[in-house]
Amino acid sequence: MSGSSGTPYLGSKISLISKAQIRYEGILYTIDTDNSTVALAKVRSFGTEDRPTDRPAPPREEIYEYIIFRGSDIKDITVCEPPKAQHTLPQDPAIVQSSLGSASASPFQPHVPYSPFRGMAPYGPLAASSLLSQQYAASLGLGAGFPSIPVGKSPMVEQAVQTGSADNLNAKKLLPGKGTTGTQLNGRQAQPSSKTASDVVQPAAVQAQGQVNDENRRPQRRRSGNRRTRNRSRGQNRPTNVKENTIKFEGDFDFESANAQFNREELDKEFKKKLNFKDDKAEKGEEKDLAVVTQSAEAPAEEDLLGPNCYYDKSKSFFDNISSELKTSSRRTTWAEERKLNTETFGVSGRFLRGRSSRGGFRGGRGNGTTRRNPTSHRAGTGRV
């Protein structure tokens, strides 16, 4: 790095060339010797600028809020402009913290305390709480007290270009580890403190992590609470696994073969023939024998083929000839046969679960205030009045 040894580099305008032959210009903000990184603020990329490289890059007009460079990939660093002189407090090691007013002459200190590194928590030493954002102007004023940067001692490499708004960035605290009693510029006397920058940063980070953990635990508590309220109600019984006889269908239903059995044309012909036969008998006045009457009573299936017009004959009898199971079979159907018939006709019915429609069902849960509508119905047959 070029420049004299007595030049305060913090706040200076730096020209940085990476090993990719890309030149950047920005304001030197922090130097992290532990991670071998350099942070520049208000950075602009000028591209490769006719330097020999396999991948030439054009210049860019965007101004990045900050860029963090890693040590081993930086080729050259040049100080373009030193920081402007600031009228600040004398370099007193007793000063722990100071705050400048809104009329500060620093070009990087607006009316509101500002720091371009407020959202850099993943970089460790560069992350700090919002109280440390006021140290930017103070660090520029105390820049002469920082040791000069020797050439070649801090290898720096371009790590990544990270863009971000100024409201989401944190500043690094550039104070010595030991602190004593100090004063602030607003006239109040500060209390003695021996906390370092890391001591101030760690409680904020631990508190933020604790808030995140609490937010993650709240949905789990709500879900567990819902489970407790569901299991406490007495009326909601768990449905038992009842094995029911399911009907197995083998293959699809053949509608063509079923319709072939019912030939309407042949049925209509037989129906007309029987109607004509009855009309002839009525005209001739022939009386039916008893054998014919008994035969017609024993064979109701033949009369059923006559169609809907012959189901009821007023002159013959008051009752109709509609087929009934009571006439065809003397045995009464059992409950299982009736259930099977209903299943074949209407399909399998769904299971009825108790206690799903209301809280606690008929019995009611704890404290739901449900009462029985007819309490005397359970006393039937006991002999009480």
Curated annotation (Swiss-Prot):
Residues 219-235 have a biased composition (Basic residues). Residues 197-212 have a biased composition (Low complexity). A motif (TFG box) lies at residues 330-350. Its main location: cytoplasm. It comes from the Eukaryota. The modification N-acetylserine is found at residue 2. This is Protein LSM14 homolog B. It is found in: Cytoplasm, Cytoplasmic ribonucleoprotein granule. SMART domains: FDF, LSM14. Belongs to the LSM14 family. Residues 181-196 have a biased composition (Polar residues). GO terms for cellular component: cytoplasmic ribonucleoprotein granule; ribonucleoprotein complex. One of its GO terms (biological process) is ovarian follicle development. CDD domains: LSm14_N. Residues 241-277 form the DFDF domain. The gene is LSM14B.
